[in-house]
Amino acid sequence: MKIWLQSGSGLSANGGTPNSRLYEDAVARRLEGVARAGTDCVVFGIGSTPFGKDRYHAAKQKVFTGLIESVLRAEPEGYDAVGVINTFDHRYYELRELLRIPVVFITESTLYLACQLAPTFAVIGHNWQIKLQAKELANHSGLA
């Protein structure tokens, strides 16, 4: 099985940024520990990470475009599923409309897991915009 994991960041494209390499290495280590034998998980980024992607709508538009352009390669390249691994579950409906393979989203999955573990839960973020986005995702998922 081949799984396409799509980040909303530029990853190696931001080679001058130490945090992008740390993130990429951490994801690779985690995948080694959780992927079943015979499952090929490959992480893809977008062209580059726009400044303010977690704060500004204009920056998010660049992320949306990069994400869709990247993920559209998954099916033709033989991937069996797509996992979107960015906090805001960008382009939820669009990706499910455009692809015939399963598309799952990390925050949606995390919110549903939290519901199974406890009657209430909290989402912690590093700025006000993340709080607003988390609330919007909870509403979208029928949890608020």
Q: What is the predicted function of each stretch?
A:
Residues 58-63, 80-81, 100-102:
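Short, flexible loop segments at the rims of nucleotide/cofactor-binding pockets, characterized by
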Residues 42-45, 83-84, 103-106:
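General beta-strand structural signal in soluble alpha/beta enzymes
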Residues 1-61, 126-144:
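N-terminal glycine-rich anion-binding loop in soluble enzyme alpha/beta folds
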Residues 56-73:
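Glycine-rich, highly charged phosphate/nucleotide-binding loops
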Residues 89-93, 111, 131:
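Short, well-ordered alpha-helical microsegments
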Residues 76-86:
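Periplasmic-binding protein-like
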Residues 95-117:
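Short, acidic/small-residue loops that bind anionic groups at enzyme active sites
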